[in-house]
Amino acid sequence: MELDTVPHELVTWADWLERYPRTTVAGARPELKNRYKKGKPDVWFASDDVMFQTPLPEDGPPPKSHMLLLRSDGQSTFVGLDRLIEIADESGEAVVQHGDRSVRLIVTEYPPTARLAAEDAASIDSMRILWISGRAISPESVLATP
């Protein structure tokens, strides 16, 4: 079985609404409230422990590190979200190397988010992913050097 990855952004509501002001949101279904509660990911993210048998990456950051995976023109690059927060300037911008080009990202610390700047969003796919998952689906990707 092969999974298809889907480019996406995980950003604050304020950031999204500023860029897409006509966005509407579907409400939660009240009859599924108990199901939503049981499916909360809090337990998974509460510790660094991996809760199932799976090969762990032999390199890079801890398995549950939040990463941004960038893909374009046959290049795949991982960027650690913690690292982006560290290097972002006071306006929330960070620059990383993706293949032979420099890519500008918009970063927030609280909550921790990162997205491609407008000039790169059309030509580069990005997705937020945990290191353990990302390394498994894209083992050829390199770790960015900001």
Labelled PLM ranges:
Residues 1-146:
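Mid-to-C-terminal functional-domain signal that highlights helix-capping/loop sites
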